[in-house]
């Protein structure tokens, strides 16, 4: 266990159900259940409104329907959940390079590895406030609970304390160093990592219901009942001793910074200033990682959603802000801005662990005397990601999936059967839409991809599929 509260745990609130409520205005404030649609289906997530009726994850769909017959049961849209998850994880990686995702909606962050004053509790509180605000903005309305503590165990306990149903209006909780043992003492033994239903039942038979009970028990008794490894671990955790490190799931192969603009940009000087600023931020992260880059990339998304990118590969490796900025601006000079730019990004890749001398030189005015290798890629964005979906079984319309009707517009499936698809024509950011039933074989009815989020994570934060 550390002497500072330097581990953060983020947990998205009712994640799948919250994504559905965000994207379907008519479901805001209503009981929403994701999963459990089929006769033998199981609930994946229930909104807080549905939980008031006793519905919870892993419950049989049939039981959930008995408890909340008027809830909206949706089949789930993994594409939307994955996109929002990538945005959340990318936001966490801005705090620290050490992020350990546990699932799509949950992760640990080692704040000591980032640029955070972990000695200052007020500063840590502010980090959590700003993190929640950024997540809400970038996911366009999703909420999360944040816990901070001196270990993974404490951070997880803190995030549970911060949950909306616990009464924390700011959804932030911090367990100060030195208070850990007292904080966890009254909690159920089930709060200890690794204690599931079977272990909890065995502890119950020993009369050990709370963490304080476990702490007071003889270690030999626990080892005899649970085995040496489990018993010893349980004793240590009950005493708030937890040295498990935050382990990043992967090493980033590139570092980039990009912004999407509210209005398309056409002025070259404005774009140049943005590119130079991005290059400086990228270099700051590059230096923090202790690496040097050989490839610099400039990315742009045009007003028509065409994605343009250009890369320069050096014969040496550098972490110089001036050098990387110079190359990025040089590539910007070849970009036609007349149609407008909606996104600009600067990235570096092809890492080395030491600086390497370049085999070409630059004159006093910054002109390259020997050209590095340049590659260029222009990719038209197809309508698939936000328009009609190409691969979909049109004979099957699961509740909740996205659709587009040539006459009525974008919406989602409320229900289907007997050759009829009942649709609600609304989408994220729209007014509550009207409900209309159309024939299943209506040629104007098309499956659709979900609307994309405006903020997209830098390329290194998008794992390859």
Curated annotation (Swiss-Prot):
Site residues, Substrate discrimination: 16
Names of required cofactors: Mg(2+)
Catalytically driven reaction(s): DNA(n) + a 2'-deoxyribonucleoside 5'-triphosphate = DNA(n+1) + diphosphate
Signal peptide: none
Molecular functions per Gene Ontology: damaged DNA binding; DNA-directed DNA polymerase activity; magnesium ion binding
Active-site positions on this chain: 106
A Gene Ontology term for the protein's cellular component: cytosol
Location relative to the cell: Cytoplasm
UniProt-listed CDD domains: PolY_Pol_IV_kappa
Disordered: annotated segments: 438-465
Family: Belongs to the DNA polymerase type-Y family.
Function: Poorly processive, error-prone DNA polymerase involved in untargeted mutagenesis. Copies undamaged DNA at stalled replication forks, which arise in vivo from mismatched or misaligned primer ends. These misaligned primers can be extended by PolIV. Exhibits no 3'-5' exonuclease (proofreading) activity. May be involved in translesional synthesis, in conjunction with the beta clamp from PolIII.
Name this polypeptide is given: DNA polymerase IV
Organism name: Cutibacterium acnes (strain DSM 16379 / KPA171202) (Propionibacterium acnes)
Recorded name of the encoding gene: dinB
